[in-house]
Amino acid sequence: MAPEFESGTKMATTIQKSSCAYVTFLAGNGDYVKGVVGLAKGLIKAKSMYPLVVAILPDVPEEHRMILTRHGCIVKEIEPLAPSLQSLDKYARSYYVLNYSKLRIWEFVEYSKMVYLDGDMQVFENIDHLFELPDKYLYAVADCICDMYGEPCDEVLPWPKELGPRPSVYFNAGMFVFQPNPSVYVRLLNTLKVTPPTQFAEQDFLNMYFKDVYKPIPYTYNMLLAMLWRHPEKIEVNKAKAVHYCSPGAKPWKYTGKEEHMDREDIKMLVKKWWDIYNDTTLDHKAQGSTVEANRLRGAAFSDTNISALYITSPSAA
């Protein structure tokens, strides 16, 4: 159940507290649940005013559901969604096919606006101001920072020609701001039926579908670890508000430091920061009125971030 807030608490926006939420996705009975717990605790530490909804597939065991509930998450079961289970060889990794199920979150119409975060992300600063972004657009961070400025780069992912013209900027689907909408949800599903599977699954699909309403936002809202060695001159790790541990060997709960790039000092520091949050028992969810909840209410719901400053003018398509 979503936490209730004191009616006297004022906010720096007209958005209703109950109408917004963060959302993530979880499948299977593996240890990814640790990532979601870490994310939930990170949002508490950042004094977010909004709950974390976890969209789970039916194969998530009851034990993991109870863990999520104990940490204050709103658990919502969804049905799997995939264009074809017979085309697993089309994906960069076979399990990417599960990620099409993320499209179900457009059906969460009890929320007017949501911020999607992958379960292997961690939030280090309050990002509630993202809910203030103007409606009717999808906001996300470019998958490669060079793409934001139209600079040629070997690290930019190849665009599947079968999906039509390449978007001017290709975003990473590990974090995005969107509005649930039943009409959009139906159109997404209908479009998926006639869209061939591609290497990066739902990420390619979302880039194709939302190319006309996509707005880039700064890398600080989804700092991919690979940017630290691909484009170190463009990255300031201490400015990252949310970090995406998506590189091979980077999942903090599996980290050994043995995979390529994982022995870097900045990676070790970010893994430690994740564990510091995960192991902090003062961030464990408690009932309303607890110290944690009181701190969330006292914290600023929105930072002093200038919302208009988030917009990055994307280069025109070639």
Swiss-Prot record:
One of its GO terms (molecular function) is glycosyltransferase activity. Keywords: Carbohydrate metabolism, Cytoplasm, Galactose metabolism, Glycosyltransferase, Manganese, Metal-binding, Transferase. The keyword Cytoplasm applies. Induction: Declines within 8 hours of imbibition in a gibberellin-dependent manner. Induced by dehydration but not by cold in germinating seeds, and induced by both dehydration and cold in leaves. Its EC number is 2.4.1.123. InterPro entries: Glyco_trans_8, GNT1/Glycosyltrans_8, Nucleotide-diphossugar_trans. It catalyses: myo-inositol + UDP-alpha-D-galactose = alpha-D-galactosyl-(1->3)-1D-myo-inositol + UDP + H(+). The keyword Transferase applies. GO terms for biological process: cellular response to cold; cellular response to desiccation; galactose metabolic process. It is an enzyme of class 2 (transferase). Its cofactor is a divalent metal cation. Expressed in seeds, mostly in radicle tips. GO terms for cellular component: cytoplasm. SUPFAM superfamilies: Nucleotide-diphospho-sugar transferases. It is found in: Cytoplasm. Its main location: cytoplasm. The active site is at residue 102. Coiled coil: none annotated. Mn(2+) binds at residues 118, 120, 244. Belongs to the glycosyltransferase 8 family. Galactosyltransferase subfamily. Galactinol synthase involved in the biosynthesis of raffinose family oligosaccharides (RFOs) that function as osmoprotectants. May promote plant stress tolerance. PANTHER family: GLYCOGENIN SUBFAMILY MEMBER (PTHR11183). This is Galactinol synthase 1. It comes from Solanum lycopersicum (Tomato).
